[in-house]
Each structure stands twice: as C-alpha cells, then as structure tokens.
C-alpha cells in the first residue's frame, strides 16, 4: 500500500509541476513592457547609434529584426501614471489604451530597409511626443506600447 500511495503522490506532483513549470520562466507583460520600452537613464543623448547599441540588451533582435521599437526616457512612475489618464481606443480596437496628457522624451528605432537578421541596423530618431499605451492588471500598469502622436 505504501509504494502504491507514493506512486500516486509522485504522479500528482509531476502533473502539477507540468502545469506550473511553463509559467515560471515566462516574462510578465509589465516586465516585457519595461524591458522593451523603458530607458530611464535617457542614454540616447542624440547618439545616432543609440538604437543599434540598445538592440541586444533590450532583446529587440531575438530571432528576427523588430521593425520598429520606441524607448521612453521618463521615470517609470510617470509612465505608469498614464494608465489613469485619458482613455482612447487601441489600434487593435481594444478599450484599455490611455494617452499621455503631456509629451514625453522618446526615441524611435526604425529598421533600415537593407538590414537582415542577425545584422539588424536601425535609424535613431529622438522626439517629444504624446504616447498611447495599453494598461492591464491589478495594479493597473503598462503592458503594451501602442503609438506615439
């Protein structure tokens, strides 16, 4: 009886770990947003090579060249506060997007036409624009960069 119970418990443990394990290493949407879009150091400083320097640490080019990416050079708290500002419709039609009430310092990285993975080459364009972000969760935080306007 003892061996039979042990086998049942072991089987249940393996089953539970099989369900839980895939989510253990998965990056959350808020963490992915921070990794892909936040550069609070504001390290671009008008460098024409900023986007090419950022492609590896921010994983802009993991398996393929990302066509466009925008970095936000503002404190995370300021970006999170946008989640309580004006609601707008997202590009995909969802209703969880919010538009910043003021402009933010951003850098747009656009893939140059002749670039192919793994040698992704980007143009760097700094500007001050309003941004639109999707927010979700509890607490309600940024999970997707939708646009700059």
Curated annotation (Swiss-Prot):
Tell me the keywords, alphabetical order: Disulfide bond, Endonuclease, Hydrolase, Lyase, Nuclease, Secreted, Signal
- SUPFAM superfamilies linked to this entry: RNase A-like (SSF54076)
Enzyme Commission identifier(s): 4.6.1.18
Q: Where is the composition biased (Polar residues)?
A: 43-61
What superkingdom heads the lineage?
Eukaryota
- What is this enzyme's catalytic activity, as reactions? an [RNA] containing cytidine + H2O = an [RNA]-3'-cytidine-3'-phosphate + a 5'-hydroxy-ribonucleotide-3'-[RNA]; an [RNA] containing uridine + H2O = an [RNA]-3'-uridine-3'-phosphate + a 5'-hydroxy-ribonucleotide-3'-[RNA]
Q: Name one GO molecular function term.
A: ribonuclease A activity
- Say if the entry is tagged with keyword Nuclease: yes
Provide the residue span(s) of the region labelled Disordered.
Answer: 25-62
Residue span of the signal peptide, if any? 1-25
> From start to end residue, where is composition biased (Basic and acidic residues)?
28-42
The reply on keyword Nuclease is yes
User: What InterPro entries has UniProt attached to this entry?
Assistant: RNaseA, RNaseA-like_dom_sf, RNaseA_AS, RNaseA_domain
Question: Where mainly found?
Answer: secreted
**Which one GO biological process term can you cite for this protein?**
defense response to Gram-positive bacterium
Binding of substrate, residues: 32, 35, 66-70, 91
Disulfide-bond pairs as recorded: 51-109, 65-120, 83-135, 90-97
Catalytic residues (positions): 37, 144
Any one annotated GO CC term: extracellular region
Query: What family classification does the UniProt entry report for this protein?
Result: Belongs to the pancreatic ribonuclease family.
- Please describe the quaternary structure of this protein: Monomer. Interacts with and forms tight 1:1 complexes with RNH1. Dimerization of two such complexes may occur. Interaction with RNH1 inhibits this protein.
Q: What does this protein do?
A: Endonuclease that catalyzes the cleavage of RNA on the 3' side of pyrimidine nucleotides. Acts on single-stranded and double-stranded RNA.
Q: What is this protein called?
A: Ribonuclease pancreatic
Organism expressing this protein natively: Sundamys muelleri (Mueller's giant sunda rat)
């Amino acid at each position: 009886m003892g061996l039979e119970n042990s086998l049942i418990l072991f089987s249940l443990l393996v089953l539970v770990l099989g369900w839980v394990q895939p989510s253990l290493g998965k990056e959350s949407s808020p963490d992915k947003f921070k990794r892909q879009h936040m550069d609070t150091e504001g390290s671009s400083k008008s460098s024409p090579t900023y986007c090419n320097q950022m492609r590896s640490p921010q994983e802009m080019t993991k398996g393929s060249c990302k066509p466009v990416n925008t970095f936000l050079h503002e404190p995370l708290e300021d970006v999170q506060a946008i989640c309580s500002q004006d609601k707008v419709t997202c590009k995909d039609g969802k209703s969880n997007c919010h538009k910043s009430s003021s402009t933010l310092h951003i850098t747009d990285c656009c893939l140059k036409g002749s670039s192919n993975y793994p040698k992704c080459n980007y143009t760097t364009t700094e500007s001050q624009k309003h941004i639109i972000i999707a927010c979700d969760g509890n607490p309600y935080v940024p999970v997707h960069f939708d646009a700059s306007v």
